[in-house]
Amino acid sequence: MKRRGMALGLAALMTCTALFTTTAKAENKGSDEKETIKFTYWGSGDEKKAIEESVDKFMEANPNIEVDLMHIPSEDFLTKLNAMIAAGEAPDVSYSASWKCQMGEDGLIYNFYDLLDDMGLSKDDYLSTCWWNWSPTESAGPVQANVTTNLMYNVDCFEEAGVDLPPTKVEEAWSWDEFVEMAQKLTLDTEGRNAADPDFDANNIKQYGVMFGTDWNVYMPFILSAGGGYLDESMDGLGLNDEKSAQILQNFADLINVYHVSPTAVQKNAMPSAATALAAKQTAMYIDGSWNHLDLMNSGCNWGVGVLPIDENYTTFFDGGSLIIFKSTKHLEASEKLYLWLTNPESSERITELYRTLWMPVQTEYYTDPDKIDFWASEELPARPEGFQDAIVKATYDHAVVATEINVKNFNEINLLCYFK
């Protein structure tokens, strides 16, 4: 589930807080009376279709619950959600990003800790790094479904260039210099010369060696591994401009401006998504979130995954939004049932498919029990290429810290000022 930078407009909604009083569990309904709950979410075309089919299965299993689905593009999501809240039409259940914690402080959403017992859940069921808390005792819940930053690539581009595939084990990870060298070999001009060739034409490139997302999730694993941070050591100032962090950002800029192995921001904005760019051989590698795996599976691309090019102090994180339940709901039990359905990797065949393609589980047992790992991460599955368990599952589980957007208060507002787009 991809999150985008979204403008936070909650201050204007403070006067609306009175609209949202804590709602007890829905009154007992007659067995034939149908409850309708509204669920707002975002996602690509493939994710939208998957959610629609998943919710259809939920309604088949729960015939007394009707789910009103509202798909909102991620870039418009918070604006639309704020408007719904202001109009007294908040959804019952919703996707959310880092702004959810402000909603928690404003009393708009349930403290998930208060719902655990009712849903038969325990905090210990979940990875410890994945809780969206706005205070030590108040939480918007665990991540709904994990994603992580990863290196994706087109296998055919590597084979055609005679270049070894990216390593899948942390102990064999490329150094940054090795990564740049590989990217040069994979960057081709219209005459077929690579970026290491002295006659390479940087003004006429047909295949880039690497592209990368421009949000925080791409550069932060490298900054954390280098000993830098999003905030400074005093935790009251920005750390991205300290020496270690600045060098990492410079490294990414050099891919564009010095080595010409990655497109400029203007060029990238005119190019397609990660899956399409890889499938079309517009780029040989792409560093971004694992949410791209579903689209890659459907793209027809011969693709693979590798560990990030970090050869010392490998540090990364799981991340993702959480499903939030609004206090204004008149159907708490129905909302809890939908929550449990969407977050249980084994609730239905369609949900299982989501956790085998688009999402990754957040429950600890799916990273520690070999049978549970194979259930969703078997490399026989079409969205789990060879090396997936080492490069994605093990590398992230063994080296995860709390994701920056979960760990930094007011992250949404800060990140809007730092968004390198």
Give the location of each predicted region.
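Short, low-complexity disordered leader/linker segments with a strong preference
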Residues: 1-38, 60
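Short, well-ordered beta-strand elements
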Residues: 33-44, 65-70, 92-93, 140, ...
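Extracytoplasmic "Venus flytrap"/periplasmic binding protein-like
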Residues: 54-126, 156-166, 276-279, 284-285
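Mature extracytoplasmic/periplasmic domains
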Residues: 57, 294, 321-409
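Hinge/lid segment of periplasmic solute-binding proteins
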Residues: 97-150, 177, 196-204, 212, ...
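Short, solvent-exposed loop/beta-turn-alpha elements that line the ligand-binding surface or hinge
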Residues: 113-126, 168-172, 200-209, 228-248, ...
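Extracytoplasmic/periplasmic solute-binding protein
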Residues: 135-144, 149, 159, 175-238
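Glycine-centered hinge/linker elements that transmit conformational signals in sensory
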Residues: 180-184, 234-267, 297, 308
